[in-house]
From Swiss-Prot:
It comes from Rippkaea orientalis (strain PCC 8801 / RF-1) (Cyanothece sp. (strain PCC 8801)). This is Trigger factor. The lineage of its organism: Bacteria, Bacillati, Cyanobacteriota, Cyanophyceae, Oscillatoriophycideae. GO terms for cellular component: cytoplasm. GO terms for biological process: 'de novo' cotranslational protein folding; cell division; chaperone-mediated protein folding; protein transport; protein unfolding. Its EC number is 5.2.1.8. It catalyses: [protein]-peptidylproline (omega=180) = [protein]-peptidylproline (omega=0). NCBIfam families: tig.
Length: 455
């Protein structure tokens, strides 16, 4: 078989394949003989239909088309094997099929063009001399104090208040009714907002809770007092019919309670943790928050290195892999949303899928390139994770998933890949020049990209 190759963009190989006269005749005759044995033609027994009648009734164009379809597929498989090519996904017929059918004459050679996706190629740049800026996250003792404050709030005892007005930090139990605010000068009766009514509703009087102005309006009220508070729903409010709307809330304070915070002592430590003393709890949290800060710094360094690797290491990606990765991105997104309690049925409907796939494509391409670049570096530098680390990570995951059905072969593969990526990034970090800057100094990559596009 005569095959001519041509390298195409997007990790494709173009193939021009010439089907020999002998092969075209053999394929056509095989198809006619098969139809002669299997076709149901009125007035004839199966297998006894004269050739000319068969051609007239079924049609030579149909026979040529079905013959050609099989012939193209078989020829492509043979060409890929002959040329020792590694193909992924389905082939793409470059020639127009209708024209090929018209050109096809059994017993004469026929040439067609197709393209196949092949494994991606990675061109490594100077990955051993990376120079990056990254943000340094420093442990802030304030985080520890905030942690204790939050736990004190959660463990607080609510004490009824009757002799004073509501203050920030209190808890109010209220009945409320929401109304659309009438337009200026409008005297019509105001309309209730559907679904915006409630009884015995708990309102924690802290800044930033609920709609802006609501908490501030309740502060200063007393039990059994009723007031009307005017607020504006934020523009990004989940209910589109209320976003940006001005509303009037009729609020009745039924109960007012003050929070009595527990002492930060050993009893408190035992209540909120597995530690017996407040000193042990404080020491453990300091260690945890310090390690988290170090990990955040490390992540910033690794993210910066990956960004630079994407710039200096071109990757030619086949569409087959991109489409598979897009599916993976959407699957993971759906699983995360379900874990958050979000109903995905309205989002993942048939008419939304093309747009969702389009939106997921940039992320899929970036993920693929990152993975392929790091895999190529690992291959070149012979970087593999230590077997003991793989076993340790697997055992830790097994403990967490003890009562679930787990494919342990797949788990081992996933953990090995994950630790390989970590090992490569740590190796690259040792060789890179890293400038650490204060947290919050660097702009996110998407902001920088937007600015460059504006320029």
């Amino acid at each position: 078989m005569k095959v001519t190759q041509e390298k195409l963009p997007d990790s494709q190989i173009g193939l021009e394949i010439e089907i020999s006269a002998e092969a075209s005749k053999k394929a056509y005759e095989t198809k006619v003989n098969t139809l002669a044995r299997t076709a149901n033609i009125p007035g004839f027994r199966k297998g006894k239909v004269p050739r000319q009648i068969l051609l007239q009734r079924i049609g030579t164009e149909y026979i040529k088309a079905t013959t050609l379809q099989e012939l193209i597929e078989d020829s492509l498989k043979a060409a890929i094997k002959q040329e020792s090519l590694e193909s992924i996904g389905d082939f793409e017929l470059k020639s127009k099929f209708d024209e090929l059918v018209q050109q096809f004459k059994p017993g004469e050679p026929l040439t067609f063009s197709a393209a196949i996706d092949v494994p991606p190629t990675v061109t490594l740049g100077d990955y051993q001399s990376l120079s990056v800026k990254a943000e340094e996250t420093v442990y802030n003792p304030e985080k520890l104090e905030n942690w204790f404050k939050e736990r004190q709030e959660q463990q607080a005892t609510l004490v009824p208040v009757e002799d004073r007005k509501a203050e920030m930090g209190d808890v109010a139990i209220v009945d409320y009714e929401g109304y659309f605010a009438p337009e200026e000068g409008e005297e019509t009766e105001r309309k209730p907002i559907p679904g915006v009514q409630g009884q015995d509703f708990r309102v924690d009087l802290t800044e930033g809770r609920f709609i802006q102005g609501m908490v501030e309006g309740i502060v200063g009220m007393q039990p059994e007092e009723t007031q009307e508070i005017t607020v504006t729903f934020p523009s990004d409010y989940p209910r589109e019919d209320l976003a940006g709307q001005v509303a009037i809330f009729k609020i009745t304070v039924k109960e007012l309670k003050a929070k009595e915070l527990p002492e930060l002592d050993d009893d408190f430590a035992e209540e909120v943790s597995e530690f017996a003393t407040i000193a042990e709890l404080r020491e453990s949290l300091e260690k945890q928050f310090t390690e988290e800060a170090q990990e955040a710094t490390k992540k910033s360094i690794h993210d910066a290195m990956i960004t630079q690797l994407l710039e200096i290491c071109p990757v030619d990606l086949p569409n087959t892999l991109i489409e598979d990765e897009v599916t993976q991105v959407l699957t993971q997104t759906a699983m995360q949303m379900e874990q958050m309690g979000i109903d995905i049925r309205q989002l993942f409907v048939k008419e939304n899928i093309p747009k969702l796939r389009e939106n997921a494509r940039p992320d899929a391409i970036s993920r693929l390139k990152q993975s392929l670049i790091l895999q190529e570096i690992a291959k070149v530098e012979s970087i593999t994770p230590e077997a003991s680390l793989v076993e340790e990570r697997i055992n830790k995951i097994k403990e967490q998933l003890s009562e679930r059905d787990v494919d342990f072969d797949k788990l081992e593969q996933m953990v090995t890949e994950e630790l390989t990526m970590e090992a490569i990034l740590n190796w690259l970090q040792e060789k890179a020049t890293v400038e650490l800057v204060p947290e919050g100094t660097l702009k996110p990559a998407e902001d920088q990209e937007a600015e460059s596009q504006e320029e």
